[in-house]
Amino acid sequence: MIYHDRNTKKRIDAIQWNGMNIYEVSSFVGTNVTCLERFNDTWLKVSTIFGSLIIPEGGYVIKHMESGKCKIDVAGKKYFETTYEKD
């Protein structure tokens, strides 16, 4: 998905982990991802050059950022989704 920062209007490439789209996320990040489950909770482990990131279900994986992840409530306030590229 293509998102833009509400403040700077910079393009952000991100995908939301919904608990079932492991192949989409793996293709998006270009590395192997691991699905972790415990009881009814599902997480995604993504390996990056900064180390492993644990993404909760509903969380976002963001390309080209040091943290590489974003919480749901932060994403809604900081970014907006667009269907077209705007530079």
Regions inferred by a protein language model and the residue ranges of each:
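A motif-centric signal for short, conserved binding hotspots located
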Residues: 1-59, 63-65
